[in-house]
Every structure is written in C-alpha cells, then in structure tokens.
Amino acid sequence: MKIITFFGSTLGIILVCLLCLINDWKIGFMMSIHVAIVAIINQIMKILIARPRPDVLPLVIERGFSFPSAHAMVSFILYGMIAYFFWNKKKIISLLLFFVILLIGVSRIYLGVHYTSDVIGGYLFSFAYLNTVFIFMKNHKWLSYT
C-alpha cells in the first residue's frame, strides 16, 4: 500500500507532472497548474476544517489535519485529467488511471491516516473541479488542449 500511496504523494505527483511536461509541454503545464491550484485549496480547506487524523496506530506518519485527503484530491485531478485526454484514444489507459485513483484513496484509509469521508470528500471536490474545468474548456474552444 505504501507504493500505491506514493503515486498520490507530492514527489509522485511532481514526477508524473514532469513526465507530462516532457511529453507535451502545453498539456503538462495546464495539468501542473490545476494540480497546484487544488493542492493550495486543499491546504486552505484543511486549516479551515481542522479535522484531526484518525486515532489509530498508522502505518505511516503524517502531519497536519485529515480532511480532505490531499492524496485523494490531487491524484484525482492529475490522473483524472490524463484519463480525460486518453479517453477517446485508449479507454483502457483511462480505466486503469481511474483504478489507480481508487487504489490511492483506499491506501490512505488502509495506512490509517484518513477516514473514509476524508477520501470521499477529496474525490467529490476534485470531481466538481474537473467537471468545471472540462465544461469551461468545451465552451471556450480556444482553451482546448486536445
């Protein structure tokens, strides 16, 4: 589970963003900006909500507040955007990425650093955020990166 959770960690997300930038700088830059925006929003939400982490012996040490899960929010944004861009070309990659998003959330619960509601809350916020971005992109074709 620690390997799975790595793909939602700061370092894991940065590495994937760098790979996206190398592959296509426009799309990679756009995804990196949205990842950064959501990461900042996540930290603001954590401070405002100030929910303590679960009172269990965690398998990894995490600092700070629990809600919403940053791993869930940011991985949903990044891997969700990549899945969106692959959807018309290679649906299997998109489906695998959604499975990775799900596994990252499950890993955070399994490792004892989040409640289920922390992960679901992160997913719901990111789902709403991505839908807003994609609707905006479709309504403003000049912003389309596909």
Q: Where do the protein language model's features map onto the residues?
A:
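Hydrophobic alpha-helical bundle signature of multipass membrane enzymes
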Residues: 1-62, 74, 80-99
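Membrane-embedded catalytic cores of phosphoryl/pyrophosphoryl-handling enzymes
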Residues: 17, 58-146
